[in-house]
Amino acid sequence: MINRDNKKAITKKGMISNRLNKFSIRKYTVGTASILVGTTLIFGLGNQEAKAAENTSTENAKQDDATTSDNKEVVSETENNSTTENNSTNPIKKETNTDSQPEAKKESTSSSTQKQQNNVTATTETKPQNIEKENVKPSTDKTATEDTSVILEEKKAPNNTNNDVTTKPSTSEPSTSEIQTKPTTPQESTNIENSQPQPTPSKVDNQVTDATNPKEPVNVSKEELKNNPEKLKELVRNDSNTDHSTKPVATAPTSVAPKRVNAKMRFAVAQPAAVASNNVNDLIKVTKQTIKVGDGKDNVAAAHDGKDIEYDTEFTIDNKVKKGDTMTINYDKNVIPSDLTDKNDPIDITDPSGEVIAKGTFDKATKQITYTFTDYVDKYEDIKSRLTLYSYIDKKTVPNETSLNLTFATAGKETSQNVTVDYQDPMVHGDSNIQSIFTKLDEDKQTIEQQIYVNPLKKSATNTKVDIAGSQVDDYGNIKLGNGSTIIDQNTEIKVYKVNSDQQLPQSNRIYDFSQYEDVTSQFDNKKSFSNNVATLDFGDINSAYIIKVVSKYTPTSDGELDIAQGTSMRTTDKYGYYNYAGYSNFIVTSNDTGGGDGTVKPEEKLYKIGDYVWEDVDKDGVQGTDSKEKPMANVLVTLTYPDGTTKSVRTDANGHYEFGGLKDGETYTVKFETPTGYLPTKVNGTTDGEKDSNGSSVTVKINGKDDMSLDTGFYKEPKYNLGDYVWEDTNKDGIQDANEPGIKDVKVTLKDSTGKVIGTTTTDASGKYKFTDLDNGNYTVEFETPAGYTPTVKNTTADDKDSNGLTTTGVIKDADNMTLDRGFYKTPKYSLGDYVWYDSNKDGKQDSTEKGIKDVTVTLQNEKGEVIGTTKTDENGKYRFDNLDSGKYKVIFEKPAGLTQTVTNTTEDDKDADGGEVDVTITDHDDFTLDNGYFEEDTSDSDSDSDSDSDSDSDSDSDSDSDSDSDSDSDSDSDSDSDSDSDSDSDSDSDSDSDSDSDSDSDSDSDSDSDSDSDSDSDSDSDSDSDSDSDSDSDSDSDSDSDSDSDSDSDSDSDSDSDSDSDSDSDSDSDSDSDSDSDSDSDSDSDSDSDSDSDSDSDSDSDSDAGKHTPVKPMSTTKDHHNKAKALPETGSENNGSNNATLFGGLFAALGSLLLFGRRKKQNK
């Protein structure tokens, strides 16, 4: 900056702080990328110097001859918060602020400029001193940073300074806690790398970065490279030898050489094969991936300091890949390959000899590189590649400092790294605060865009002026020629935007959408001046932030390189009228050489080749041509390993020849030959003639200024052997092959290798012989399948050639056939099972000699799995049998014959008892004829009853019966009755009866009755019966009854019965009855009944009766079930109701007698 108010030395606390920031862009030469370095020069000493460990500041003053005799004491005053107002919580949260001690000046006093939040007292009457420049040792721990910091304060500004610029009043523009921009869609641009201040001597402010070769100049035009492929290869080879570390390059005394973008993008490879023109990510195997940020120590991406993000990936390419196939490399969405230019074309993948393996294209929208393979992959095999890609934080997607998880991917395989994004802070001195970066380089239009933040901390600044200089500036703000420049004149595009109080500026110092800010460019039409390649904008008094966008022209150097520098500074006056300066200088300098020289292209390096011959060494002597049957071997894989570990492979041609070219003198290579299947390597160095011998499977060779075509190797066919022998029937089961024992044919034999893989299957011939042929030396396993109907014999009982080896055995081939693997089997014996089913008449479960067998009983046989393997029926003697059974577990199931009942089981010995309906049995080397079963027939009933009954009964019965009965009755009755009766009856009966009866009856009755009866009966009967009965009765009854009964009966009965009975009854009754009665009856009844019934009844009966009867009846309580156990009925009422039951039975028999009498009389009448 030029001090136009006082061209002599500034004498009052005048210091300038310099910041040198670098800007990384990508420049493509010979398929590689170059870094263009930028630096920033800062005016206004600030606290930011503390961030760079090596930064120092120098305080200098020029003596003013006109004022040295007139110095007055300076009254020191405190300026509180001189650099902290409006920025305590702003995203631009750090200030670089430096203060100088006060120096005496004759005409004025002033307060000192202070460090942030500190008070400093100035002294007075200090003799002015000449400002001297101090050389500072350059910093080397920031790759592309070169900063110097100095502060200069000018003489009090003229009184009319405040009147030069009228500032637009702003409404409430306080400091805000963050600076933000509206989100914008990603756009492709090149990144600017700005670094924090580092001290350098003020006389050396340039940065030079070698983009291709740090040792020698390379002056080759793009046209020459296109027309000269060999020169292109040479440059790539030079690049592969370049030291790509991040250490500084020795150039100018204080320059620091940063890493080259994409300088490490080297690939070593060898060939694939696949399907044409498709993505083959699945055929790419990633072996290593790493992400490194800057120096890799703290993972901090200092986006304004030129710190790059380095992505290293190593991968192999499958041999299936073919020309035209593609693979992908993905950048993280928050990075870009370059943000100063739009040149994002990726480097081609080449091998160390310069052959192109794949060409890449970059998609800005997806941030993805697509590589398309050349015919290289059709010529070579086993390709291994390494790739190093550099990228930078995308300021569009990352506008403010933050933490990110960056993810990169090769062929879809991802790796991630956490990083912290750090942006620069404004330079601050007093109320002056400013920062700037280069944002876009257009090499076609030869323009550079710079964006400047003016007063980003929104301080209240007075007499504000901003200078934009087309060069760097020195410590005093004077233009410094050389080391880059731009053209600043009336044709320079300068736009000014005002930031409202509610808007926040992005910390990235990069604006993509200016429409969100107020365009106030027109307000500076009369407040903008140009002079000596400097534009000055007069802002006047401000308390808002502003953005200046400058698009200036530049002139490339004669060799087409870029020497671009542009500075900007802000000056304001403090309350005493003294100027405070703060500023930046941005510059880009590129060069393709750093070591000097005449700029001519280095003579092309001579390259060499190696190779020769692979042959079949029939006589195994290791010497070519000693046997007429020897011939070349085609399609043998030969792999070359480069000194850096990368490889490529070729196959021998039809003549057995191979060759590798493009090899460098003095370097050591390794050649490996893959042993073809079915061959073995021959003898090594079988002769002293290096042109005729075999060098073995692997040979190392060093290039000594000439080709080496003597690297040969020979192979011979591996001999083959047989394995096998014999499978025989071991009739005596001794495990030894006897002369009279025959072979077994069609036995399956399986051969497996040492890994268990089946390599052959065969069957024995008619003699029991088998053989496997064409086998190599090694261990094998033989498995014999047991033939149907045979059992394996004992093994290993005698010598190998005569014994049995077992179902699975191991055989070893060692330079000879192995015909000792035998196996013996004997026929498996069969067994029978069965016995007898009989009629167990006495139901004791034992087979008695008098009991007979039951024929046609179905018997089923099941195996252990429950599968039916046989069904038969017993013969006329009750016998059954199953034959041809193996040892094992079985189940025998007997089907019960109709009408018969299963007898009791397991009552005696197995061969005489009954085993039940289902029997489990195990056969172990013998027959089993003990599986028997017995059945018996249920009993029937025969009853003969003769009853003569004379009964006079007066009965009062009270019965409570609950009965559940299901009854099925079929009755056929034929009755012929002739009755003459005269009856006079006076009966008074009170009966309460509730009856539920279900009856099915078929009755045919013909009755002729003449009755004369005189009966006087007074009966009061109240009967309540609740009966619950469940009865299953099967009865066959033949009854012949003759009864003569004279009875006078008066009975009143009330019964409530609920009965469920299942009864099957077949009754044939013939009754002949002749009855004449008027009377008084005396009844004697004798009944013998045998009944099997199951009944449950609850009965309550109260009876008053006078009767005489004799009834021998089996009590119901002694009725038995099918287990022959007494089954008692539940008690219902009093136990002395026997007489009541007798009366009821007496009445029943009297009625039966009358029926018989009537029938007899009728017959007599007939």
Swiss-Prot record:
Residues 53-606 are annotated as: Ligand binding A region. A motif (YSIRK-G/S signaling motif) lies at residues 23-34. The keyword Secreted applies. The keyword Signal applies. Residues 908-918, 935-1105 have a biased composition (Acidic residues). Pfam families: Big_8, Gram_pos_anchor, SdrD_B, SdrG_C_C, YSIRK_signal. InterPro entries: Adhesin_Fg-bd_dom_2, Adhesion_dom_sf, Fibrogen-bd_dom1, Ig-like_fold, LPXTG_anchor, SDr-like, Sdr_B, SDR_Ig. Residues 607-719, 720-829, 830-940 form the CNA-B domain. Keywords: Calcium, Cell wall, Peptidoglycan-anchor, Repeat, Secreted, Signal, Virulence. Residues 1-52 form the signal peptide. Residues 77-90, 166-178 have a biased composition (Low complexity). GO terms for biological process: cell adhesion. It comes from the Bacteria. It is a peptidoglycan-anchor. Residues 1133-1166 form a propeptide. The modification Pentaglycyl murein peptidoglycan amidated threonine is found at T1132. A motif (LPXTG sorting signal) lies at residues 1129-1133. One of its GO terms (cellular component) is extracellular region. Residues 54-230, 904-1141 are annotated as: Disordered. Gene3D superfamilies: 2.60.40.1280, 2.60.40.1290, Immunoglobulins. Residues 118-129, 179-212 have a biased composition (Polar residues). Residues 61-75, 92-108, 130-145, 221-230 have a biased composition (Basic and acidic residues). Cell surface-associated calcium-binding protein which plays an important role in adhesion and pathogenesis. Contributes to the resistance to killing by innate immune components in blood and thus attenuates bacterial clearance by interacting with host complement factor H/CFAH and modulating its activity. Inhibits also bacterial opsonization and killing by interacting with host complement regulator C4BPA and thus inhibiting classical complement pathway activation. Interacts with host complement factor H/CFAH (via C-terminus). Interacts with host complement regulator C4BPA. This is Serine-aspartate repeat-containing protein E.
